[in-house]
Amino acid sequence: MCARTLGKPDFPRLRVRFGKDGRLAYLGHLEVINTVMRSVRRSGLPFSVGNGFAQRMRIQFSQALPVGAASRDEYYDLYLTERRDVTEAFEALKASSPSAMAPLEAAYMTPRLPALEAWLTRSAWEAHLVGTGDGFCASAFDDALRDLREQGVIHFMRGDKPRSIELGTTLVDWSARDAVLEGSWRTIDLTLKTRSSNLGALRPAVLIEAAMGTAALSGTTLDSLRVLRTGQWHEEEDGTLVEALSPELRLG
């Protein structure tokens, strides 16, 4: 159910938090978008469409989750042509969505907020690393990340194109601890806090790959990696973090 927008009124802005189960970790961002849009159409909610020829659904997503990562804190803003009871809307979306991407929370938000992708600039991550080698341990990984931070920039390839990312602002903080041994493998649990900007976003897998190439982890091998995004926030100029579904930003 949809309706073409004729002007620029403040249509109800329904913000939905959803997860991306590990089973769908390798689902790309475009596939996530298409899956959500199909779920919205099946839900029967009166979504708004733009004025362009293609009549695209008016929906905005938070920053793309890297392929290979799961999440329990993704968001989209869906613009409706009429306000429905928030519980009714949430249940309709939940019923029409795959269980591995089911909505977790929903609320109507202030209409004049910036687009999600630009507004949510801080992320928190958990990574579980499994590797081999006597030097594969939390203290060595901590040394590797410290060396990279002092280096300032890491260079990597995305496809066949060289890329670089500056760590001074994008890598906010981290902690590493040794986890339970898994047979002959050693494991590390890593938490990361990152910041994105117009200059780019730091992907955990890129940082971890760069760390494995440092002297601190020489002679070790990373055998498997699981990454989970655990949170996203807006960062104010004074460093205060604002939740995407902050009560202060909700409409009653």
Language-model segments: residues:
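Extended, well-folded interaction surfaces typified by the phenylalanyl-tRNA synthetase beta subunit core
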Residues: 12, 17-19, 23, 27, ...
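Ordered, amphipathic secondary-structure segments that act as subunit-interaction surfaces
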Residues: 72-126
